[in-house]
């Protein structure tokens, strides 16, 4: 969500256009109960999952991001659900992944695909019940798979019991759980929101003649982290899920939670700079250190700082072990590579982005390695080549890259098959609220809607949210009903059933890549060194840990390339991984289009 999501919406809109009180009381009662359940005895072992997690386990895992709405439908309503995921756990186990990151499944009116939460201790009805969740978690742990959940606490839904009470009266005990500006003080200080048609992050609320703050949509009022009672509510929610046995949290939009409640002027806010202005507010790290003391230090959880910091140095503050905050960062720099050039980017840009972050994180802290997510286009369409001749080799190359870099790899559902952008041509096919609102704005401003549609075909978030392609059965085996979002028509040839039977498929290459990383720890912990930096087609680097050394050579082009081995490097044997059937060792490597090699070195 957050930075990459904000980036996309800004790009779409700017680049192409000229009973409440009682409910709240019930919530508070539930909070007190969960706090009692999460006492020291329940957390003494520091590991409630039963997996015997060692410290730092999250460095060696491979994370599979699973978008529940699009993975597997179990009841024919066209929406993926928890029972559907449970039915596919053996498939997830077969991949070799160690951790699933699940996008939000909490109670929600679903204004923003679950990132607007109305009940942090319930399951969204579209996805099932808490019993379904318990069965899913048990099934994952039985197969040695850990579960990480999104923690979305920069804001709640406006349908949360806290907000319903807060907006009903200025004297509500939940009033200070949110940010308010009384109308009698005049217009509130300017705050920018891409998600508002007027680009205003303040929404007037008539019942109490006040404005409330929403960095995201008006359906997502910002929570007031200056209030210690609100912070304790969040910590109790975290204990509730940790005591259930989940294995980690991805801290969604957390870089925005700290705000100066006096709202000093922020002159000159624009679409290009407002997210940086909101980052790293006062007391942000005080909150994280408090969270660590109160909750995280009592469990062996994987904690991920989404969008942490405006640069690698700032991000390090979140994950420096000496600071006792979070485990790893998840940056968005790669999202901006070639973002305004449809179908094009420069390899040098990717090298520079990953090199910059690697330099800062080489000896301390830890980072995530990823190229795709629910907020971005499919990686083979964005960074590879989705033409039929090159889809498979380029998808394999991108997998090789993710599994051979320094950091914890994140693989998005469907990328293991080489799923591609769907390239909708009609606005009626889109479900993404950002795309639909953007189209309406272009239309209202009499802009070029045809150009906007072409842009969406490349960059809409719906490209990465199409249903998983299980087989050549109707709707790709995803549902017996009408899918909530159209299935990519290439499912007849790009699907799990076909690829499992093909030893040279993208899917089986993905399995081999994970097995390679698990076998050779130099690919987890080894030092990264870039080679031939100026080469516009080849990305080559070594990974070194003591006497162990590996060479990774990636041809990011649709043409054959020749690459001479640098002086002092000698291949020690057969490739650990190769996305083509043959390899000829020698002083110069002959590389096929989109060929990817991982080679042991002497």
For the regions a language model picked out, list residue spans one by one.
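Beta-strand-rich binding/interaction modules
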Residues: 560-580
């Amino acid at each position: 969500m957050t930075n990459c999501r904000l980036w996309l919406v800004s790009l779409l809109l700017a680049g192409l256009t000229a009973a409440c009180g009682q409910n709240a009381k019930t919530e508070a009662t539930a909070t007190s109960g969960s706090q009692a359940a999460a006492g020291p005895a329940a957390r003494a072992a520091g590991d409630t999952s039963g997996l015997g997690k060692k410290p730092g386990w999250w460095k060696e895992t491979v994370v599979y991001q699973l978008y529940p709405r699009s993975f597997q439908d179990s009841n024919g309503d066209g929406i993926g659900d928890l029972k559907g995921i449970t039915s596919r756990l053996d498939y997830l186990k077969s991949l070799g992944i160690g951790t699933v990151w699940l996008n939000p499944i909490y109670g929600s009116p679903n204004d923003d695909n679950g990132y607007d939460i109305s009940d942090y201790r319930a399951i969204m009805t579209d996805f099932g019940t808490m019993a379904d969740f318990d069965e899913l978690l048990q099934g994952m742990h039985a197969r040695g798979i850990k579960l990480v959940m999104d923690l979305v606490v920069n804001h709640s839904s406006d349908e949360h019991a806290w907000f319903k009470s807060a907006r009903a009266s200025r004297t509500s005990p939940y009033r200070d759980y949110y940010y308010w500006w009384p109308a009698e003080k005049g217009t509130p200080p300017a705050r920018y929101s891409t998600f508002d048609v007027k680009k205003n992050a303040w929404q007037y609320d008539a019942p109490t003649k006040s404005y409330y703050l929403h960095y995201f949509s008006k359906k997502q009022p910002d929570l007031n982290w200056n209030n210690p009672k609100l912070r304790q509510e969040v910590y109790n929610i975290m204990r509730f899920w940790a005591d259930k046995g989940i294995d980690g949290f991805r801290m969604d939009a957390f870089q925005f939670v700290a705000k100066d409640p006096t709202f000093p002027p922020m002159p000159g806010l624009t679409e290009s700079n407002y997210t940086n202005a909101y980052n790293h507010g006062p007391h942000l790290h005080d909150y994280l250190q408090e969270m660590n003391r109160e909750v995280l230090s009592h469990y062996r959880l994987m904690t991920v700082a989404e969008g942490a910091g405006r640069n690698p140095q700032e991000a390090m503050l979140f994950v420096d072990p000496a600071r006792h905050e979070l485990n790893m960062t998840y940056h968005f720099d790669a999202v901006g590579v070639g973002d305004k050039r449809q179908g094009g980017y420069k390899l040098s840009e990717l090298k520079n982005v990953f090199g910059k972050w690697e330099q800062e994180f080489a000896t301390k802290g830890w980072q995530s390695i990823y190229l795709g997510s629910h907020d971005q286009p499919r990686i083979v369409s964005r960074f590879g080549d989705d033409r039929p001749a090159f889809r498979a080799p380029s998808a394999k190359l991108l997998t090789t890259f993710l599994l051979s870099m320094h950091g914890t790899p994140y693989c998005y559902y469907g990328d293991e098959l080489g799923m591609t952008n769907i390239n909708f041509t009609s606005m009626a096919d889109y479900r993404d609220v950002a795309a639909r609102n953007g189209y309406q704005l272009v239309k209202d401003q009499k802009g070029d809607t045809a150009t906007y549609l072409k842009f969406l075909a490349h960059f809409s978030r719906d490209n990465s949210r199409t249903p998983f392609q299980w087989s050549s059965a109707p709707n790709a085996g995803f549902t017996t009903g009408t899918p909530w979002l159209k299935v990519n028509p290439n499912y007849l040839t790009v699907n799990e059933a076909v690829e499992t039977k093909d030893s040279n498929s993208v899917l089986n290459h993905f399995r081999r890549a994970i097995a390679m990383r698990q076998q050779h720890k130099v690919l987890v912990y080894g030092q990264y060194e870039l080679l031939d930096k100026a080469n516009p087609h080849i990305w080559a680097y070594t990974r070194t840990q003591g006497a162990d050394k590996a060479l990774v050579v990636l041809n990011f082009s649709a043409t054959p390339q020749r690459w001479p081995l640098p002086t002092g490097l000698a291949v020690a044997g057969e490739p650990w991984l190769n996305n083509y059937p043959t390899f000829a060792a020698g002083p110069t490597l002959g590389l096929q289009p989109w060929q990817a090699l991982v080679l042991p070195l002497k």
